[in-house]
UniProtKB/Swiss-Prot annotation:
Record-linked InterPro entries: Cyt_P450, Cyt_P450_E_grp-I, Cyt_P450_sf, Cytochrome_P450_fung
Family: Belongs to the cytochrome P450 family.
Keyword NADP: no
E.C. code: 1.-.-.-
Transmembrane segments: 3-23
Protein name: Cytochrome P450 monooxygenase 231
Taxonomic lineage: Eukaryota, Fungi, Dikarya, Basidiomycota, Agaricomycotina
Topological type in the membrane: Single-pass membrane protein
Domain of life: Eukaryota
The protein's annotated pathway: Secondary metabolite biosynthesis
Length: 567
């Protein structure tokens, strides 16, 4: 398609007029919260690394205060840098702040507007949320504990077998971020992915070698965290660019291609589940159960996207597919990220690690593995997990909200349509709330004389951290995530001595610096890049118990009708 000079001139006029109106409107509606000075039309766009914005946002928080106003092109952004501001706006006033500023490429194109994470607040989102909350809520999540128990035993076995593999200097990340098979990152990822896959589709990830399904999940996750980062594409911050013809909008073809790639994977899982349901084979996950209920209501065949318009509001096929994929992606990636950060921080703080071992030996000993009954008996371990989530939140900026109407906070205007970011990173780095915030200090959360709660629920008072978000957008999967963190990390501390390799030339430990931004990936999720860790059984008795437990687990899989592990 050819674009004439007149068309380009019209486009330039539209863009210029949009910028003028935007700034004129902003001037008339002052006072806005304080913030850095920008340049006409582009605002602060060139002052922020779009793929890693949270370090700059922290600097602005320290300079301008708890609420900062910035402009990213045509997008007005309000950054909330204190727990008080975030709690007041995103929780107390959640009716006004529960929508999303959906990234155009990630939401409209890649997920065809079916990704729950970025759905605007409305009927469709409420229907999806109701189904998800019923699946992941406190009561339902306890039913997952048997699976978490069994899958965590498989982790111990795999680390026992491949505990020294990850130390090799040749065992490094692939050119596109691929994690080598048998690397301890892959072993952890298999656990989190298998758990979510069983929950959604009724089948396990039962191999760590030659398992394209596991690699595909993380390829999709990696791509999604990059394309969904606010500001990743100019069209996300200049909505007027969405009107451009295809020849001038390369992101459009790129996004649609990504959608086809995703649906090639997620769509096959969905269709296989439907076939298994019709054949009466396999176990039920969420998808099979939902499709059965839908069929019993006379709505067996619902192609397309969105929900039905009747009172029942049944999710159509593509929305069911993306609801399942969203839970798998979020539950797999963020939980494994927290586990990688825990190991990094514990190795970087050997005194905290040694104290965790001593507590484990005193409470559990070597004659059994830690179990759910030990959760309140291991306050130091639990404090270490909480401090990990504070010091290295998987999503430093959470997922942005959007205000539906003008609002005023502390005398400052928050305009309708603004993107509103709960700056988890700035809140967690607040030196008043968390003295010496860059230090790893589990004693912040160590209360051995009290019955321990994770204290991370939607109740805003006395929250330890904010990684699960705020208000009506609070993460439904927190109970499953917290349970996984406890059972896996407690057993890891119980069963193994952790160590890191040394550089052959310098003799220095090959452990990345947690204070170096380059240690973590960019994009929506900040995960440690792969690093070498060895896992040595703490004794022969521990090793034999891990082996025996793994053998017992195979009998459990068989009795449950699930695939046994192939090693």
């Amino acid at each position: 398609m050819d674009v004439s000079t007149n068309e380009l001139a019209i486009l330039a006029i539209v863009l210029l007029a949009t910028g003028v109106l935007f700034y004129a409107k902003g001037t008339r509606r002052a006072p806005l919260p304080p913030g850095p000075r920008g340049i006409p039309f582009f605002g602060n766009l060139f002052q922020v690394d779009a793929m890693r914005p949270y370090p700059q946002y922290l600097k602005w928080a320290q300079k301008y205060g708890p609420v900062v106003s910035i402009k990213l092109g045509g997008q007005h952004v309000i950054v909330l840098n204190s727990s008080e501001a975030a709690d007041e706006l995103l929780v107390t006033r959640s009716k006004q702040y529960s929508s999303r500023e959906s990234p155009h490429v990630a939401f409209d194109l890649v997920s065809d507007q079916q990704q729950m994470l970025f759905m605007p607040y409305g009927r469709e989102w409420k229907i999806v949320r109701k189904n998800v909350h019923g699946l992941l809520g406190p009561g339902s999540s306890k039913q997952m504990r048997k699976m978490q128990d069994l899958e965590s035993r498989v982790i111990l076995h795999d680390l026992l077998c491949h505990g020294e593999t990850s130390i090799s200097e040749d065992f490094v990340e692939g050119p596109h971020g691929e994690v080598p098979e048998r690397h301890w990152f892959s072993i952890i990822r298999r656990y989190t992915t298998s758990l979510m896959m069983t929950l959604m589709y009724g089948h396990r990830i039962h191999r760590i070698v030659d398992n394209p399904e596991l690699h595909q999940v993380y390829a999709v996750v990696s791509n999604f965290t990059h394309v969904s980062q606010p500001g990743r594409y100019l069209v996300d911050v200049f909505p007027v660019l969405r009107r451009l013809p295809d020849i001038m909008a390369p992101w459009r073809a790129e996004g649609k291609k990504m959608h086809e790639w995703e649906m090639g994977f997620w769509g096959k899982l969905f269709s296989d589940s439907r076939t298994a349901l019709l054949d009466g084979s396999g176990l039920d996950g969420f998808v099979q159960s939902y499709l059965r209920s839908r069929a019993e209501a006379g709505c067996e065949d619902l192609p397309g996207k969105g929900v039905t318009e009747d009172a029942a509001g049944w999710m159509r096929d593509k929305l069911v597919t993306y609801t399942a994929s969203g839970i798998i992606e979020a539950g797999s990636d963020t939980t494994s990220t927290a586990m990688f950060s825990f190991v990094l921080l514990m190795l970087s703080n050997p005194d905290a690690l040694q104290r965790a071992k001593e507590e484990m030996d005193a409470v559990v000993g070597s004659s059994r593995m830690p179990g759910w009954e030990d959760e309140d008996r291991l306050p130091w371990l639990k404090a270490c997990i909480k401090e990990t989530l504070r010091r290295a939140p998987p999503l430093p900026l959470g997922v942005p909200h959007k205000t539906e109407e003008d609002d005023v906070y502390n005398g400052r205007l928050i305009p309708k349509g603004s993107t509103v970011i709960g700056n988890i990173w700035a809140i967690h780095m607040d030196p008043i709330r968390y003295p010496n915030p860059t230090s790893f200090k589990p004693e912040r959360f160590y209360h051995p004389d009290e019955k321990l709660d994770w204290a991370s629920g939607p109740d805003t008072h006395d929250r330890d951290h904010y990684i699960f978000g705020w208000g009506r957008r609070f993460c439904s999967g927190k109970h499953i995530a917290e349970a996984s963190l406890f059972i896996v990390l407690s057993r890891l501390i119980w069963g193994f001595d952790l160590y890191t390799g040394s550089d052959a030339k310098t003799g220095q430990a090959r452990l990345p610096d947690v204070n170096d931004e380059a240690t973590f990936t960019d994009g929506l999720v900040a995960a440690p890049k792969i690093y070498p860790v060895g896992f040595k059984p703490r004794s022969e008795k521990h090793a034999e118990m891990i082996k025996a437990s793994y053998r017992d687990v195979q009998n459990d899989w068989q009795s449950m009708g699930l695939a046994g592990d192939e090693r």
